[in-house]
Amino acid sequence: MRIILLGAPGAGKGTQAKIISEKLNIPHVSTGDIFRANIKGNTPLGQKAKEYMDKGELVPDELTVEIVKDRLGNVDCVNGFILDGFPRTIPQAEYLDKVLVQMNINLDVALLIDVKDEDIIKRMSGRRVCTNCGATYNVVFNPTKVEGICDVCNSPVIQRADDAAETVLNRLETYHKQTQPLINYYEKAGKLKVAEGAGEVDETSKRVMKALGI
C-alpha cells in the first residue's frame, strides 16, 4: 500500500506512521529524515539541499521531489511506503504526481489524521523532548516518571522552541493556508481517507486502520 499522510503539525502522523509501518511491513518515509540522511551522507542531492539551507532559503520543490524520488526508488519501497511531511502544497503534490507516474507507482491513499486546533495546541505546548536520545513526552498525556528527566537515559527533557504556544499557532496558520488545500486536491482525485485523530493513540490507530481498510 502506498500512502501519503496528511495532518497538522502535532496531529500524531509520526506515531501512526510507525504503527502502520509495523503492521504492513512498509517503510515510514519521513522527508525530514531523508534530508538529514542526505546531508549527513554528503550525497550530491544533500550537498545541493545544504547550500539552500545554509543560506536560510527554502529548498526548491524540484530538489525536494528528487530527494523523495531517490528514496522511493529503494528496494524497501517496492511493496509500498508511508510518505510523511511531503507534499505540503499543491505545486509539490503536482510535482510528486509526475514523479510517481515516471516511476510507474500508483498512490493508493492520502490519509488525513484530523485533529482540532485546540487539541493540537494542548498536545504540542505540552510536548517535551529528551536532549540526548530524542524520546518524546507530554506533560499531560505522557509525563516523565521524574519531572524534567528522561525515563530512557536520565538526561534533561526540554520544550523545543517550535512547541511554544505562540509558535504552534503560527505553524497552524501556515498549515491551514498551505496544506489544507491538499485535502481538496486528493479528495477530487478520489484518494482521500479521513481518520479522527483525537484521543488515545490506540483509539486513533483503530480509526486509521479502518480508514485504510485494514
From Swiss-Prot:
AMP binds at T31, R36, E57, L58, V59, G85, F86, P87, R88, Q92, R160, R171. Residues 30-59 are annotated as: NMP. Zn(2+) binds at C130, C133, C150, C153. ATP binds at G10, A11, G12, K13, G14, T15, R127, T136, Y137, G199. One of its GO terms (cellular component) is cytoplasm. The keyword Zinc applies. One of its GO terms (molecular function) is ATP binding. CDD domains: ADK. Monomer. This is Adenylate kinase.
